[in-house]
Amino acid sequence: MTDVTTLPDRRLLLVHAHPDDEAIGTGATMAHYAATGGHVTLVTCTLGEEGEVHVPELAQLAAAGADQLGGYRIGELAAACRSLGVTDHRFLGGAGRYRDSGMMGLATNEHPRAFWRADLDEAAAHLVELMREVRPQVMVTYDDNGFYGHPDHIQAHRVAMRAYELAAVEGFAPAKVYWTAMPQSVLEAGMVHFAGSSDNPFAGIEEAVELPFCTPDDRIAARIDATGQHAAKEAAMRAHATQIPDNSWLYSIAANFGSEFMGVEYYTLAVGAKGPGAGPYGWEDDLFAGLPVAAGPDRTRAGVTGPW
């Protein structure tokens, strides 16, 4: 167990569903805080057993074959964490406790170990124990739709928010909780840029608001500019070779937008008070904005209504 008194003053916890989610969605943020002296703890909820395999010689590892992909992805995730400078990684409940549920509506949702079926309080208890150990001031996870509707992402959100509630009762919940997001203006700029191109990732989309992760700019709370870490993020993504092929549209976008795409990440604020910001919407440039060195007592929800 980690002795919290030996950890850096700024402690960030991220809760993700599968290996590779951390790199794609929050890799620059993680690398930024790791490089600037923060303690970054990554929790991954499943091994990603139901993922596709984009490395031909490893195709038989897939769930329909040898069903060994999850074990292989442990190594990919370890390599990604090294690229990001993250040394504290945990699997929720231990590696293999929860299984990748697959996409919504598939029979894999009903697997006995599917994360989608996990008892909420039991799963949250694993996260509460980690919070008690590390005492993060800031937690990052997904919104209630799991960013794009994958059952494991939705469940990661539910587990993280339930863990927050349970930890709050004991007095050590994070002071701020953020959800990953993508501003509408950024998506609209991307749609304009790729219109008519052969590798258009927005093909078939008429308006940005059709995308499940589109967030109005005025709802964004933080813009983390970690462009200096764009190479670390890309290296972490490339570590997940079974999931992200070299010809992925993600790298195509990166080739066009460079460090802006790889190094800038956005968040909405679900819990806590928004700190000082800039620009027309007062976007924070630091997830710890407004917090003292140690976690403060303000754990009120910010503009979030209804159940998590």
Swiss-Prot record:
Keywords: Hydrolase, Metal-binding, Zinc. Its cofactor is Zn(2+). It holds the Pfam family PIG-L. GO terms for biological process: mycothiol biosynthetic process. SUPFAM superfamilies: LmbE-like (SSF102588). Disulfide bonds: none annotated. It comes from the Bacteria. The keyword Hydrolase applies. Zn(2+) binds at H18, D21, H153. It catalyses: 1D-myo-inositol 2-acetamido-2-deoxy-alpha-D-glucopyranoside + H2O = 1D-myo-inositol 2-amino-2-deoxy-alpha-D-glucopyranoside + acetate. Its EC number is 3.5.1.103. Catalyzes the deacetylation of 1D-myo-inositol 2-acetamido-2-deoxy-alpha-D-glucopyranoside (GlcNAc-Ins) in the mycothiol biosynthesis pathway. PANTHER family: 1D-MYO-INOSITOL 2-ACETAMIDO-2-DEOXY-ALPHA-D-GLUCOPYRANOSIDE DEACETYLASE, N-ACETYLGLUCOSAMINYL-PHOSPHATIDYLINOSITOL DE-N-ACETYLASE-RELATED. Belongs to the MshB deacetylase family. This is 1D-myo-inositol 2-acetamido-2-deoxy-alpha-D-glucopyranoside deacetylase. It comes from Salinispora arenicola (strain CNS-205).
